[in-house]
Amino acid sequence: NLNEKQRYSIINQLASSYRIQKDYQGLILFLTDWVEENPNDMYNSYWLLMTADAYRSTGAEPVAEYYFDRILQQCPDLLVKGTSVHFKCLQNLIQISKTPAHRIKYFNELINRFPQNVNTTELYLRLAIEYQSDNQWDQALKAYSLFLEQPDATTIQIPGEPDAYKNARHLVDFNNSSQDWTFESLPALEEAVKKAIRTYNWRQLDKYKAKVNFFTMSWKQDENDANSQEETPMASWARGKRIRYADTLDEASNPNEAYLRTWGWATYVPIFYFYFRKVDFPLNPDIHGNWEWAGIYLGNKL
């Protein structure tokens, strides 16, 4: 005839003794038997949390994931020492779950149910990346937009995502643009740019610039610097001078990026490296894999 709290105290003491001895199999057997025989115990979510933790401690992460998820689906939430059991489950699940669809569900639950306990700016970004991995591009763009709207989006340091803001900004802006400046191949882009220089057609050269996030900067600058995004017509840098270009692309070029050395510009740095980049935008198959002129690096390569 023990009341709920007395019963909780006894079960918790027994479970703790198993855990202290690192007898995880004994702990799992004891708690799963208890939950099965006492389906109405108000602390079952906590006993199953201990079960999931025990499985995780033994390296059985898929089984741990099953129990963490089962708690979310079947058990009411419970505060233990001031912490929500459901919150602890979600924290574990985003660490061990490998399936994008599941991870999407868990990130959404964390954002919607526990915004005060998490960094929503980081989670919007991680949610967007999961949607992208799952080819849910419309949802990915919505999540990227929410990330960009956060006041600390430009300054937040997110582990494993050093270019978070730049990549999100580029994707969202690219999606909202005309997307009409790309070339089907790198040789086509290279020849068009060279022809415009050769014929002094600076207006045409300006048209080849990417309409989103085109930059002009030194090799040490950051693409996101406000100064690097300022547009300057190519004619104002040419000023009637004879501009020359290398016969071939720079040796640092690779399958996704290319550099064309040009020189003779009427500016304090007469050498410009034109930066060409392969377009990574699966949302529009017509241009995905095309090439764009994405920016200009000033001066010799470092």
Residue locations for each model-derived region?
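Generic structural signal for hydrophobic core residues of well-folded globular domains
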Residues: 55, 196-197, 209
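Solvent-exposed, charged amphipathic helical/linker segments at domain boundaries
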Residues: 170-187
